[in-house]
Structures are given as structure tokens and as C-alpha cells.
């Protein structure tokens, strides 16, 4: 089996692809896998040490760009398709799986022109532009949420969002917090950070400490705000672990009691598997407002509380955190409901569908 996974640029796109690639290699140990992605740091760090082949093509996104940037992206498209075709010609894949992000478009188009079977996975409740276009040519379309996007029914499968194996394994090791340990708040702004989330949480924690609250904080800040957040917590003499990007999310999740996060689909899938309750602050400028729609599904299921960034300040967020963080029963109920929304079998479902496609083609 020779598999190409294409996508990336954010952890939300990359990590489901990694989950499927690792699962395929476990299922068929002789599988050779190539990732075609971006040159961004998250792709490089995320794939580090996994033993997959890697390639990068030059491509740019269209959505949310100005006129000049769009024209430049369109001008790059023929070259990107040519680069992708050359890479695919050398690798000769049996199947190409697109996991979202602008880099997928040229690769999937080149694959289809070569007669290679193509699948896509959509993590969000609203598909990105690349997947909306790719859905027209894909042989199989995998969606993550029951409230997910409308694609051609005969080719669409509800699979859930693949979660990396080390996080699935960690979910079985999660235990209640020891009574002598202060509760731990985990703060996630996505793989690239979120300035407003960082600022709001710092203000909220300052208020909580001033009111005598005991807590520990683990905070993924992104590169931009790392120093600011570290200085704020040091001034409070708070027990805190901060990083621009955590590589071992499984161990981070195991330490958390409550999460404050954006509403990216892959983060939500991981939190659901772990059974972690979450206060969600959706990114208000996300394409087609997909983060709010992602978060609403988990909030309606009882595992999350959905907050609007425009209505928040440090005091309000402190009250929301305090209501949950110091009430073990509330945390337990929300965590249990969050776990019922998980689809830990998503990776295996996608692999089954991919292998069925390849086997059908080989008959």
C-alpha cells in the first residue's frame, strides 16, 4: 500500500492525517506513506520523528485574501499542480487522502488527473473552500459531525474526526484529581495561539488569585504571547507551565481538570475522547463561523459551555471558570457527557473505507 496524505498548515488539519497514517501503518506494516504539506512550523514539528516521507509544494490560500493575493494564488496554481503531479508520478500512490488546507487542492487535482483514487476528510461543521471544491472530484468524503456539511450522499460517510493513538491510549489512563492537588486549568488557543484568549485568561486568573483561588495553569500560548503570559503568571507566583506549542498533548490532557479553548474541530475531538469539560471561546472571524457551529454541537450535548468573545472580560471569564473548576460534581457530569460525544473509532472507519476503495479498484 502506498498512501499520500496531503494537508496541514494548522494542527487541526495535520493531526487527523497523522492519526490515519499511523493507523494505516499499524494495520498494514508494509505501507509507505508520503505527506505533502506546507513549510509551516506546525507541519515540521508535528511530523518530526514519525518516519514518514515528506514533500512541500508552493501554494497559497484564496479565502479571506485581498485581490492581489488572490491573483497571485491563482497564478501559482498551475505550477503547484505541476509540482504535485511530479511528486505523485515519482511516488505512485494507490490512494491520496486530503485532510484540508489550501495545499490539498493542487495535490488532489493532480491525483485525479493521474487516475489515482482520492478521499477527503472534513473536520469542521462547515467545509473549507479546498474541501468544498475537492468534494466534487473525491471518490469518498469523510465528515466528522452529524451536523456536518452537505456533500453528495452516495460518496459521504460519517466517520468522526481521527484522534492520534497516544491520545486514545491516554484516555484510558485518566484518573480523578487527588484531593491534595489544586485543580488544573488547561488553556489552548490552537497550534498558532490566540491573543484574545491569552489576554482574557490572564485577566481571569489574576482575578481568581486575588479572590483567593488556588489553581494550577497549563497554557499553550503560541509564539507571540509566550513571554507576556509567562511574566503575568510569574508576577502572581502561580504554579504554571507555559509553552508556545506542546508536543506531547497526551500528557498535558492527563493533567487537566477543565479546559478553556477555541473551538477547532480536532481539539474538540481530542477533548471528547479524553472526557474533558471545556469552556469554548470560538474564533469570531473563522471562515463561515465554523468554530461557533462546531462548539454549539458539543455545548448542546452537555460537554461544553459556549461563550462569545465579544461579551467576555476577565471578571466574567473568572466567574465561568470558578463555577466549574471548584465543583467536582459539575466537572464530572460535563466530562461524562463530553465523552459520549466522542468517536474514538474514527481512524479505523476511515482506514476501512480507504482500503475498500483500493481493493475495489484492484478487482
Residue locations for each model-derived region?
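Conserved nucleotide-sugar phosphate-binding/catalytic loop shared by glycosyltransferases and other
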Residues: 3-8, 30-76, 223-225, 310
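Active-site-proximal region of nucleotide-activated glycan assembly enzymes
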Residues: 31, 53, 112-172
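An amphipathic, basic-hydrophobic alpha-helix
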Residues: 66-95
Amino acid at each position: 500500500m502506498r498512501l499520500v496524505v496531503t494537508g496541514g498548515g494548522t494542527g487541526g488539519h495535520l493531526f487527523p492525517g497523522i492519526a490515519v497514517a499511523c493507523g494505516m501503518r499499524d494495520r498494514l506494516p508494509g505501507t509507505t506513506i508520503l505527506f505533502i504539506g506546507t513549510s509551516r512550523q506546525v507541519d515540521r514539528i508535528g511530523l518530526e520523528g514519525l518516519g514518514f516521507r515528506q514533500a512541500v509544494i508552493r501554494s497559497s490560500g484564496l479565502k479571506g485574501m485581498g485581490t492581489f493575493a488572490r491573483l497571485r494564488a491563482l497564478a501559482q496554481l498551475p505550477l503547484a499542480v505541476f509540482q504535485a503531479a511530479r511528486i505523485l508520478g515519482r511516488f505512485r500512490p494507490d490512494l491520496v487522502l486530503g485532510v484540508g488546507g489550501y495545499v490539498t487542492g493542487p495535490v488532489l487535482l493532480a491525483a485525479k488527473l493521474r487516475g489515482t483514487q482520492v478521499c477527503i476528510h472534513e473536520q469542521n461543521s462547515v467545509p473549507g473552500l479546498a474541501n468544498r471544491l475537492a468534494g466534487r472530484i473525491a471518490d469518498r468524503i469523510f465528515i466528522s459531525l452529524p451536523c456536518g456539511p452537505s456533500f453528495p450522499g452516495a460518496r459521504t460517510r460519517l466517520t468522526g474526526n481521527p484522534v492520534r493513538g497516544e491520545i486514545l491510549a491516554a484516555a484510558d489512563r485518566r484518573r480523578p484529581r487527588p484531593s491534595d492537588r489544586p485543580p488544573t486549568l488547561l488553556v489552548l488557543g490552537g497550534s498558532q495561539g490566540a491573543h484574545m484568549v491569552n489576554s482574557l485568561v490572564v485577566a481571569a486568573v489574576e482575578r481568581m488569585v486575588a479572590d483567593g483561588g488556588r489553581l494550577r495553569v497549563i497554557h499553550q500560548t503560541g509564539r507571540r504571547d509566550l513571554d507576556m503570559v509567562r511574566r503575568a503568571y510569574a508576577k502572581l507566583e502561580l504554579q504554571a507551565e507555559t509553552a508556545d506549542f506542546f508536543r506531547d498533548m497526551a500528557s498535558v490532557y492527563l493533567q487537566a481538570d477543565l479546559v478553556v479553548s477555541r473551538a477547532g474541530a480536532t481539539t474538540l475531538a481530542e477533548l471528547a475522547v479524553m472526557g474533558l469539560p471545556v469552556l469554548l471561546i470560538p474564533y469570531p472571524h473563522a471562515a463561515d463561523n465554523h468554530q461557533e457551529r462546531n462548539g454549539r454541537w458539543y455545548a448542546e450535548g452537555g460537554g461544553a459551555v459556549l461563550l462569545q468573545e465579544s461579551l467576555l472580560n476577565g471578571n466574567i471569564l473568572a466567574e465561568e471558570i470558578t463555577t466549574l473548576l471548584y465543583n467536582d460534581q459539575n466537572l464530572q457530569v460535563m466530562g461524562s457527557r463530553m465523552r459520549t460525544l466522542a468517536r474514538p473509532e474514527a481512524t479505523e472507519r476511515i482506514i476501512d473505507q480507504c482500503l475498500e476503495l483500493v481493493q475495489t479498484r484492484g478487482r
